[in-house]
Swiss-Prot record:
Residues 176-196 have a biased composition (Polar residues). It holds the Pfam family zf-RING_2. This is RING-H2 finger protein ATL7. The lineage of its organism: Eukaryota, Viridiplantae, Streptophyta, Embryophyta, Tracheophyta. The RING-type zinc finger domain mediates binding to an E2 ubiquitin-conjugating enzyme. It is found in: Membrane.
Length: 236
Protein backbone atom coordinates (compact mmCIF):
# COMPACT_ATOMS: atom_id res chain seq x y z
CA UNK A 1 0.00 0.00 0.00
CA UNK A 2 1.12 3.49 -0.84
CA UNK A 3 0.38 6.32 1.43
CA UNK A 4 0.31 9.90 0.32
CA UNK A 5 2.72 12.22 1.87
CA UNK A 6 0.90 15.08 3.54
CA UNK A 7 3.90 17.35 3.09
CA UNK A 8 3.93 16.83 -0.67
CA UNK A 9 2.61 19.85 -2.70
CA UNK A 10 -0.63 19.16 -4.50
CA UNK A 11 -0.57 19.36 -8.29
CA UNK A 12 -2.52 22.46 -9.45
CA UNK A 13 -5.49 21.80 -11.70
CA UNK A 14 -5.13 23.27 -15.23
CA UNK A 15 -8.30 24.61 -16.95
CA UNK A 16 -8.65 25.08 -20.77
CA UNK A 17 -9.03 28.76 -21.84
CA UNK A 18 -12.66 29.73 -22.56
CA UNK A 19 -13.63 30.33 -26.17
CA UNK A 20 -16.41 32.76 -25.28
CA UNK A 21 -14.59 35.84 -26.63
CA UNK A 22 -13.76 34.15 -29.91
CA UNK A 23 -17.29 32.93 -30.39
CA UNK A 24 -18.64 36.43 -29.81
CA UNK A 25 -16.25 37.87 -32.38
CA UNK A 26 -17.29 35.20 -34.86
CA UNK A 27 -20.97 35.98 -34.34
CA UNK A 28 -20.36 39.69 -34.89
CA UNK A 29 -18.42 38.97 -38.05
CA UNK A 30 -21.17 36.73 -39.40
CA UNK A 31 -23.82 39.32 -38.59
CA UNK A 32 -21.80 41.98 -40.41
CA UNK A 33 -21.40 39.76 -43.46
CA UNK A 34 -25.14 39.11 -43.66
CA UNK A 35 -26.18 42.71 -42.98
CA UNK A 36 -24.04 44.30 -45.73
CA UNK A 37 -25.84 42.74 -48.74
CA UNK A 38 -29.22 43.32 -47.10
CA UNK A 39 -28.47 47.02 -46.64
CA UNK A 40 -27.15 47.23 -50.19
CA UNK A 41 -30.33 45.71 -51.64
CA UNK A 42 -32.48 48.15 -49.65
CA UNK A 43 -30.45 51.08 -50.98
CA UNK A 44 -30.77 49.86 -54.57
CA UNK A 45 -34.52 49.38 -54.23
CA UNK A 46 -34.90 52.86 -52.79
CA UNK A 47 -32.95 54.42 -55.66
CA UNK A 48 -35.05 52.55 -58.22
CA UNK A 49 -38.23 53.69 -56.52
CA UNK A 50 -37.10 57.32 -56.64
CA UNK A 51 -36.28 57.01 -60.36
CA UNK A 52 -39.69 55.47 -61.00
CA UNK A 53 -41.44 58.35 -59.25
CA UNK A 54 -39.49 60.92 -61.25
CA UNK A 55 -40.37 59.26 -64.54
CA UNK A 56 -44.03 59.22 -63.66
CA UNK A 57 -43.90 62.88 -62.69
CA UNK A 58 -42.35 63.79 -66.06
CA UNK A 59 -44.80 61.71 -68.09
CA UNK A 60 -47.87 62.99 -66.28
CA UNK A 61 -47.54 66.47 -67.79
CA UNK A 62 -50.48 68.54 -68.93
CA UNK A 63 -49.88 68.24 -72.66
CA UNK A 64 -52.83 70.46 -73.49
CA UNK A 65 -51.33 73.38 -71.58
CA UNK A 66 -47.98 72.82 -73.27
CA UNK A 67 -49.68 72.74 -76.65
CA UNK A 68 -51.49 76.02 -75.95
CA UNK A 69 -48.25 77.68 -74.90
CA UNK A 70 -46.05 76.42 -77.68
CA UNK A 71 -48.70 76.51 -80.41
CA UNK A 72 -47.72 73.04 -81.62
CA UNK A 73 -49.89 70.07 -82.48
CA UNK A 74 -50.59 67.79 -79.53
CA UNK A 75 -51.86 64.30 -80.39
CA UNK A 76 -55.17 63.38 -78.81
CA UNK A 77 -55.98 60.16 -77.01
CA UNK A 78 -57.76 58.80 -80.07
CA UNK A 79 -54.69 59.29 -82.25
CA UNK A 80 -52.47 57.66 -79.65
CA UNK A 81 -54.79 54.69 -79.28
CA UNK A 82 -54.94 54.11 -83.04
CA UNK A 83 -51.17 54.39 -83.33
CA UNK A 84 -50.58 51.97 -80.47
CA UNK A 85 -53.33 49.45 -81.20
CA UNK A 86 -52.95 49.39 -84.98
CA UNK A 87 -55.70 48.86 -87.52
CA UNK A 88 -59.11 47.53 -86.67
CA UNK A 89 -60.24 44.10 -87.75
CA UNK A 90 -62.65 45.45 -90.37
CA UNK A 91 -59.90 47.41 -92.09
CA UNK A 92 -57.53 44.43 -91.97
CA UNK A 93 -60.11 42.24 -93.67
CA UNK A 94 -60.55 44.82 -96.45
CA UNK A 95 -56.96 44.41 -97.63
CA UNK A 96 -56.68 42.75 -101.07
CA UNK A 97 -55.90 39.03 -101.22
CA UNK A 98 -53.55 37.71 -103.93
CA UNK A 99 -52.91 34.07 -104.90
CA UNK A 100 -49.20 33.43 -105.34
CA UNK A 101 -48.08 31.73 -108.52
CA UNK A 102 -44.58 31.18 -109.84
CA UNK A 103 -45.51 32.67 -113.20
CA UNK A 104 -47.22 35.63 -111.55
CA UNK A 105 -44.89 38.57 -111.04
CA UNK A 106 -44.77 39.44 -107.33
CA UNK A 107 -42.28 41.82 -105.77
CA UNK A 108 -41.36 39.46 -102.93
CA UNK A 109 -40.79 35.72 -102.87
CA UNK A 110 -40.86 35.37 -99.08
CA UNK A 111 -42.72 36.88 -96.16
CA UNK A 112 -40.76 39.57 -94.35
CA UNK A 113 -42.53 38.85 -91.06
CA UNK A 114 -41.84 35.12 -90.67
CA UNK A 115 -39.09 34.88 -93.35
CA UNK A 116 -40.90 31.93 -94.92
CA UNK A 117 -40.95 31.29 -98.68
CA UNK A 118 -44.22 31.54 -100.57
CA UNK A 119 -45.74 28.35 -101.92
CA UNK A 120 -47.71 27.95 -105.12
CA UNK A 121 -51.45 28.69 -104.90
CA UNK A 122 -50.94 30.28 -101.49
CA UNK A 123 -53.17 33.17 -100.47
CA UNK A 124 -51.27 36.31 -99.63
CA UNK A 125 -52.41 39.69 -98.43
CA UNK A 126 -51.14 42.72 -100.32
CA UNK A 127 -50.53 46.24 -99.04
CA UNK A 128 -52.45 48.70 -101.23
CA UNK A 129 -50.05 51.57 -100.60
CA UNK A 130 -46.74 49.89 -101.50
CA UNK A 131 -47.69 46.56 -103.11
CA UNK A 132 -45.74 44.31 -100.72
CA UNK A 133 -47.26 40.90 -99.97
CA UNK A 134 -47.25 38.85 -96.76
CA UNK A 135 -48.84 35.76 -95.28
CA UNK A 136 -52.37 36.50 -94.17
CA UNK A 137 -51.75 35.30 -90.61
CA UNK A 138 -48.46 37.19 -90.32
CA UNK A 139 -49.72 40.52 -91.59
CA UNK A 140 -52.91 40.24 -89.55
CA UNK A 141 -50.87 39.77 -86.39
CA UNK A 142 -48.58 42.64 -87.37
CA UNK A 143 -51.38 45.11 -88.08
CA UNK A 144 -53.00 44.49 -84.71
CA UNK A 145 -50.23 46.59 -83.15
CA UNK A 146 -48.90 48.61 -86.13
CA UNK A 147 -50.27 50.81 -88.90
CA UNK A 148 -47.33 50.59 -91.31
CA UNK A 149 -45.93 48.09 -93.76
CA UNK A 150 -43.40 45.83 -91.99
CA UNK A 151 -41.00 46.03 -94.94
CA UNK A 152 -40.94 49.68 -96.06
CA UNK A 153 -42.70 51.27 -93.03
CA UNK A 154 -45.15 53.09 -95.29
CA UNK A 155 -48.27 54.14 -93.40
CA UNK A 156 -51.57 52.54 -94.39
CA UNK A 157 -53.60 55.42 -92.95
CA UNK A 158 -54.17 58.16 -95.58
CA UNK A 159 -53.02 61.59 -94.57
CA UNK A 160 -55.83 64.18 -94.37
CA UNK A 161 -55.62 67.06 -96.83
CA UNK A 162 -54.85 70.24 -94.96
CA UNK A 163 -56.57 73.54 -95.76
CA UNK A 164 -53.31 75.32 -95.09
CA UNK A 165 -51.75 73.98 -98.26
CA UNK A 166 -54.76 75.19 -100.28
CA UNK A 167 -54.57 78.59 -98.66
CA UNK A 168 -50.84 78.80 -99.27
CA UNK A 169 -51.35 78.02 -102.98
CA UNK A 170 -54.00 80.72 -103.19
CA UNK A 171 -51.68 83.21 -101.51
CA UNK A 172 -48.85 82.32 -103.87
CA UNK A 173 -51.11 82.66 -106.92
CA UNK A 174 -52.37 86.06 -105.74
CA UNK A 175 -48.78 87.21 -105.21
CA UNK A 176 -47.84 86.01 -108.68
CA UNK A 177 -50.82 87.82 -110.18
CA UNK A 178 -49.88 91.03 -108.41
CA UNK A 179 -46.30 90.69 -109.60
CA UNK A 180 -47.55 90.04 -113.12
CA UNK A 181 -49.65 93.22 -113.03
CA UNK A 182 -46.68 95.24 -111.92
CA UNK A 183 -44.58 93.66 -114.65
CA UNK A 184 -47.26 94.52 -117.24
CA UNK A 185 -47.35 98.17 -116.15
CA UNK A 186 -43.59 98.50 -116.32
CA UNK A 187 -43.36 97.77 -120.09
CA UNK A 188 -46.13 100.32 -120.72
CA UNK A 189 -44.19 103.05 -118.94
CA UNK A 190 -41.03 102.05 -120.78
CA UNK A 191 -42.80 102.15 -124.15
CA UNK A 192 -44.21 105.59 -123.35
CA UNK A 193 -40.78 106.98 -122.50
CA UNK A 194 -39.35 105.42 -125.66
CA UNK A 195 -42.10 106.99 -127.78
CA UNK A 196 -41.46 110.42 -126.25
CA UNK A 197 -37.73 110.15 -126.86
CA UNK A 198 -38.41 109.04 -130.46
CA UNK A 199 -40.62 112.08 -131.15
CA UNK A 200 -37.94 114.34 -129.70
CA UNK A 201 -35.36 112.79 -131.99
CA UNK A 202 -37.65 113.25 -135.00
CA UNK A 203 -38.25 116.91 -134.17
CA UNK A 204 -34.53 117.53 -133.75
CA UNK A 205 -33.87 115.83 -137.08
CA UNK A 206 -36.46 118.00 -138.81
CA UNK A 207 -34.92 121.12 -137.32
CA UNK A 208 -31.47 120.08 -138.48
CA UNK A 209 -32.75 119.37 -142.00
CA UNK A 210 -34.48 122.77 -142.15
CA UNK A 211 -31.31 124.53 -141.05
CA UNK A 212 -29.27 122.64 -143.66
CA UNK A 213 -31.75 123.55 -146.39
CA UNK A 214 -31.62 127.21 -145.36
CA UNK A 215 -27.84 127.18 -145.48
CA UNK A 216 -27.84 125.62 -148.96
CA UNK A 217 -30.31 128.22 -150.21
CA UNK A 218 -28.16 131.05 -148.86
CA UNK A 219 -25.08 129.54 -150.48
CA UNK A 220 -26.91 129.27 -153.80
CA UNK A 221 -28.00 132.89 -153.59
CA UNK A 222 -24.48 134.03 -152.84
CA UNK A 223 -23.10 132.05 -155.73
CA UNK A 224 -25.72 133.50 -158.10
CA UNK A 225 -24.89 137.05 -156.90
CA UNK A 226 -21.18 136.63 -157.52
CA UNK A 227 -21.79 135.19 -160.98
CA UNK A 228 -24.00 138.17 -161.93
CA UNK A 229 -21.30 140.62 -160.73
CA UNK A 230 -18.68 138.93 -162.84
CA UNK A 231 -20.90 139.09 -165.91
CA UNK A 232 -21.56 142.86 -165.49
CA UNK A 233 -17.87 143.49 -165.09
CA UNK A 234 -17.12 141.70 -168.35
CA UNK A 235 -19.85 143.55 -170.23
CA UNK A 236 -18.61 146.92 -168.98
Amino acid sequence: MSYSDPNQNPIPETYAPSNSTESEKLKLYQAFIFSVPICFTFIVLFVLYVIYLRRNSTTNVDWSSLGMRGGTFVPTNNNLSTAELGLSKDIREMLPVVIYKESFIVKDSQCSVCLGDYQAEEKLQQMPSCGHTFHMECIDLWLTSHTTCPLCRLSLIPKPSLDLSHQSTEIVSSIENSNGGEASTQPDSQSATEAISHTDDVEEGNRDSQEVSKETEENDRNSVGTSDGCCTCRLG
